[in-house]
């Protein structure tokens, strides 16, 4: 004889269809996730979009550069790839605390070594490109430096450090910062003290850019420069010592792809 009366929980669960069981399980998981998200939202502080990290520096510091291995050059049937790091600019704070800035167009002809390879190809694109600041001044040096990458050559030049600090992914730091991040010169996985601005290759306008030399690029209008240059690094500073002071070096760490070989004598 079948049992009569209330059905137990186990029997009730067993009598449900597979679809009903899946629906109940999914509903339970959704409710669990919603509770977790609600708890996280209550716990997370409001953010302005700014991040910071404290800086501790020695009384004196410096960086020794060496090149234990050659730049990496590899090829396939269609492209040539080059990986390297090279010095591209020196940064000096203007006298009497005045504002000053340096621009570094992110094109291969502005790397003195890379430019010679770029002359051999018609087109190129960055696989990755980063600008690294390495200090060369004592920790007693006063002032502030800001570094950012802008993606429109038509933008006018900055006149204040505030303007540069408002750019996408800008970094502001004292001129003596960055000793501990020298490993960023060699690879992407650098320490927390590195001062690096990295090109966002998803934001560039074109897939490929035509090769152009320094002189020809400098002579272009700002509108035309956008056809040859995906972005420009800006390094600016103010509040420096009474006399103009060299405070750091700018290195470009890159992985670049070239296509369409061409005779350098006809490459502009």
From Swiss-Prot:
Protein name (database record): Capsid protein
GO molecular function, one term: RNA binding
Region (S domain, virion shell): 78-258
Stretch list, region R domain, interaction with RNA: 1-77
The protein's assembly and partners: Homomultimer.
SUPFAM superfamilies: Positive stranded ssRNA viruses
Annotated region (Disordered), positions in chain: 1-21
Source organism of the structure: Tobacco necrosis virus (strain D) (TNV-D)
Family per record: Belongs to the icosahedral plant coat protein family.
Subcellular localization, as worded in the UniProt entry: Virion
Residue ranges of coiled coil: none
Region (P domain, projecting): 259-268
Role description: Capsid protein self-assembles to form an icosahedral capsid with a T=3 symmetry, about 28 nm in diameter, and consisting of 180 capsid proteins.
Recorded GO CC terms: T=3 icosahedral viral capsid
The keyword RNA-binding is annotated on this UniProt entry: yes
Keywords of the record: Capsid protein, RNA-binding, T=3 icosahedral capsid protein, Virion
